[in-house]
Curated annotation (Swiss-Prot):
Superkingdom: Eukaryota
The organism's taxonomic lineage, starting at the top: Eukaryota, Viridiplantae, Streptophyta, Embryophyta, Tracheophyta
Organism (species): Arabidopsis thaliana
Similarity comment: family membership: Belongs to the protein-tyrosine phosphatase family. Non-receptor class dual specificity subfamily.
Name the record gives this protein: Probable inactive dual specificity protein phosphatase-like At4g18593
Length: 142
């Protein structure tokens, strides 16, 4: 195979990979496996300065960068307590009523130290991150 043929083959493969849709990330309740959020519902935040951001009494003395123990999402229809007029409350799974996280319209601090406002927090320990092929028919209503 000549250099030109190899180059064309590499270009063809890379353009083919770029045209393929990325796998979609779904977040499911660990207890009942219902989909509670998809990648498009995630509200990104800049990681904070770790322990420096917390009050002195909350610090553990560990100087390493802390990973986020939660994901933050936009408000969604299944979050019944936000429609009941509450300012802050637990977020319960609409399938099994298991506790998935917490919300606060005034905001809350992530474990990495960043402040997220308003905050609809899902604990990573209570949800599973699942990758799947994109489905154009899947639409999580917000």
């Amino acid at each position: 195979m000549t250099d030109l043929q190899m180059e064309v083959e590499v270009d063809t493969n890379s353009s083919l990979q770029e045209s393929l849709p990325k796998p979609q990330v779904m977040y499911r309740c660990k207890k009942c496996r219902r989909i509670v959020a998809i990648e498009e519902n995630i509200v990104p935040h800049e990681p904070g300065k770790g322990e420096e951001c917390f009050a002195w009494k909350k610090r553990s003395g560990n100087s390493e960068q802390v990973q986020c123990s939660s994901i933050f999402v936009e408000p969604m229809k299944w979050m019944q307590t936000i429609h009941d007029g509450m300012v802050e409350e637990k977020l319960l799974c609409f399938g099994c009523n298991g506790r998935l996280g917490y919300f606060n319209w005034a905001g809350m601090q992530c474990s990495c130290g960043a402040w997220v406002n308003p905050a609809f927090q899902l604990n990573k320990s209570r949800i599973d991150e699942c990758k799947s092929e994109p489905n154009p028919n899947l639409n999580m209503e917000t």
